[in-house]
Amino acid sequence: DTAEITTENGQPVCVASLNRSFGHPAYTGRLRVIRAGDSLYLVNILPVEEYLKGVVPSEMPASYASEALKSQTVCARSYAFTAIQNPKYSFADLNDSTACQVYMNQNTDPRTDNAVESTAGEVLSFHQQIASAKYFSSSCGSLSSDDDVWTYPDTGQGDSYMTARLETEPPTLCALSSEAAFVDFILHPEADTYLEASDPWFRWQVTLSMTTIRSNISELFARRMAADPKRFTLLSSDG
């Protein structure tokens, strides 16, 4: 069962039952309510360029420099189009959380609106295809190769343009395959060379019991093996 909500004059529709960081969000376009079993899903139907006006200020502070906002916009637009080409959901192209891109967690802003409008239609591409522009809010200073995180079911490989490297200026290749190199990288980073060194999540600590660590690793390995068994080699009890 579905129902659609629109306004006669095209004004945004405020959803008072939702709370975001700035209050109750108001959505442009059409709102579709879908009932599936005991759940209700609220789907916002609107053009990509209007969608981006709700994404960019939610993913990057509107106070950032205009060129940074434009870069974020191009990444967000590229991500959105690749998601539309490869939908995860039966009733929508994306969701509004960090599982895709955060949408309408911050109100729209003239500065981010301008970034969207001034880059209209611009995307990242690789070999004439729109690139899947995955991005993040914080890291330890190192990027991973796409093969290490995401792979395509038909090839078992990721996107070749996403390669492992350190987030330095200029970028440098990763050399963290040995235990000693990784420990040194974590404990003694050259803070002035990493772009995110001032971020509070650049380095952090947590204490876990060995039981919890074993349980977490076993669960994660089991899930990854089920999803992509070809990437694992099992060691038998006899070596």
Question: What is each of the regions a protein language model found here?
Answer:
Residues 1-239:
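Conserved, single-site charged/polar hotspot
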